[in-house]
């Protein structure tokens, strides 16, 4: 693997590994985890890459191999060294970056590929949710070797599961059944079902500044905002992508700014509160762009990864000026 620092972008090439997900550490500035797969995730192995910035661009701190493609990654909220990945063999893997050995624990219950995993952000609880092609969401306590609960209701692949950063025990899921669903761990069931698109929904995220606001990204190339107090119509719709939207993320620094990446090879930045909502289009990949994250420490820094075998950290121009 080779690092390049070109212009404002720091880049790491990952030969033979296609990027699926990227997430900045909530603790260490600049540290990035990236979940990758061989052969575009269709066959072969996977590798978890832990990267740090250096003078040359990006430095590989550690890598962990798994015997199937890795599709998502999430950092622990109470231990800076610990993170979880999920894979095509239906399992989740718990890793410790302070150790070069294999996973500390493997959780194998899903019957098909696990496409999404997220660690709860409210410090009072340490829970993980995973979403699978088997149409279920599972709830895990990482200290326990088996799931605590299984949530059923989706009628197709679950592509995205993400905890509310505001409400303990509440998470959202997005599915190929065209719905966004809000779940309550305490009730062990679904609270709200939103028919959000007339197409598969590949991603969702919560606004960091409004506990009632979520965004969905779908195969219909649209982003839609949803206010949980009234879900009959979206509160905003953002158009511009020309192929399916693979991932969407709200900014942790700006209440109305979000980013999306797509199978059209681009990353786009938006401010849904402005009439001209598209702030910037970044075109620096040559394949599907699947992973995307905002830095939690730097208001201007973003990371993405692509099937073109590159990982990039950069500062888009639109984030260096007031949104």
From Swiss-Prot:
It holds the Pfam family WD40. Keywords: Cataract, Cytoplasm, Deafness, Disease variant, Ichthyosis, Peroxisome, Peroxisome biogenesis disorder, Protein transport, Repeat, Retinitis pigmentosa, Rhizomelic chondrodysplasia punctata, Transport, WD repeat. It is found in: Cytoplasm, Cytosol; Peroxisome matrix. WD repeats lie at residues 65-96, 109-141, 153-184, 196-227, 240-271, 284-315. One of its GO terms (biological process) is protein targeting to peroxisome. PROSITE patterns: WD_REPEATS_1, WD_REPEATS_2, WD_REPEATS_REGION. Changing residue 113 to R: Impaired binding to cargo proteins containing a PTS2 peroxisomal targeting signal. GO terms for molecular function: enzyme binding; peroxisome matrix targeting signal-2 binding; protein homodimerization activity. GO terms for cellular component: cytosol; peroxisomal matrix; peroxisomal membrane; peroxisome. Its main location: cytoplasm. Gene3D superfamilies: YVTN repeat-like/Quinoprotein amine dehydrogenase. The keyword rRNA-binding does not apply. Ubiquitous. Highest expression in pancreas, skeletal muscle and heart. Interacts with PEX5; interaction only takes place when PEX7 is associated with cargo proteins. Interacts with VWA8. It is linked to Peroxisome biogenesis disorder complementation group 11: A peroxisomal disorder arising from a failure of protein import into the peroxisomal membrane or matrix. The peroxisome biogenesis disorders (PBD group) are genetically heterogeneous with at least 14 distinct genetic groups as concluded from complementation studies. Include disorders are: Zellweger syndrome (ZWS), neonatal adrenoleukodystrophy (NALD), infantile Refsum disease (IRD), and classical rhizomelic chondrodysplasia punctata (RCDP). PANTHER family: PEROXISOMAL TARGETING SIGNAL 2 RECEPTOR. Belongs to the WD repeat peroxin-7 family. Receptor required for the peroxisomal import of proteins containing a C-terminal PTS2-type peroxisomal targeting signal. Specifically binds to cargo proteins containing a PTS2 peroxisomal targeting signal in the cytosol. Cargo protein-binding triggers interaction with PEX5 and formation of a ternary complex composed of PEX5 and PEX7 along with PTS2-containing cargo proteins, which is tranlocated into peroxisomes by passing through the PEX13-PEX14 docking complex. This is Peroxisomal targeting signal 2 receptor.
């Amino acid at each position: 693997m080779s690092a390049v620092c070109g212009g404002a972008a720091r880049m790491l090439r990952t030969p033979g590994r296609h990027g699926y997900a990227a997430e900045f550490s909530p603790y260490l500035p600049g540290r990035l985890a990236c979940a990758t797969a061989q052969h575009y995730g269709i066959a072969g192995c996977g590798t978890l890459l832990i990267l740090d910035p250096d003078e040359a661009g990006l430095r590989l701190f550690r890598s962990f191999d798994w015997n199937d493609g890795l599709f998502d990654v999430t950092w622990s909220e109470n231990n800076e060294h610990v993170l979880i990945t999920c894979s095509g063999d239906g399992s989740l893997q718990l890793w410790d970056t302070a150790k070069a050995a294999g996973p500390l624990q493997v959780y194998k219950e899903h019957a098909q590929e696990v496409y999404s995993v997220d660690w709860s952000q409210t410090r009072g609880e340490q829970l993980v949710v995973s979403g699978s092609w088997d149409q279920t969401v599972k709830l895990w306590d990482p200290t326990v070797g088996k799931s605590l609960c299984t949530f059923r209701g989706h009628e197709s692949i679950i592509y995205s599961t993400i905890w509310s950063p505001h409400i303990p025990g509440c998470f959202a899921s997005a599915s190929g059944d065209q719905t966004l669903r809000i779940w309550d761990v305490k009730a062990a069931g679904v609270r709200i079902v939103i028919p959000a698109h007339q197409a598969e929904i590949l991603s969702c995220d919560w606004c960091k500044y409004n506990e009632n606001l979520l965004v969905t990204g779908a195969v219909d190339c649209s982003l839609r905002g949803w206010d949980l107090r009234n879900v009959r119509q979206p509160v905003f719709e953002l158009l511009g992508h020309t192929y399916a939207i693979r991932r969407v993320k709200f900014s942790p620094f700006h209440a109305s700014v979000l980013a999306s990446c797509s199978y059209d090879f681009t990353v786009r930045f938006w401010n849904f509160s402005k009439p001209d909502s598209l702030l910037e289009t970044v075109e620096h990949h040559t394949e599907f762009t699947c992973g995307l994250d905002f830095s939690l420490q730097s208001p201007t820094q973003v990371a993405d990864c692509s099937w073109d075998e590159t990982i990039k950290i950069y500062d888009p121009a639109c984030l260096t000026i007031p949104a």
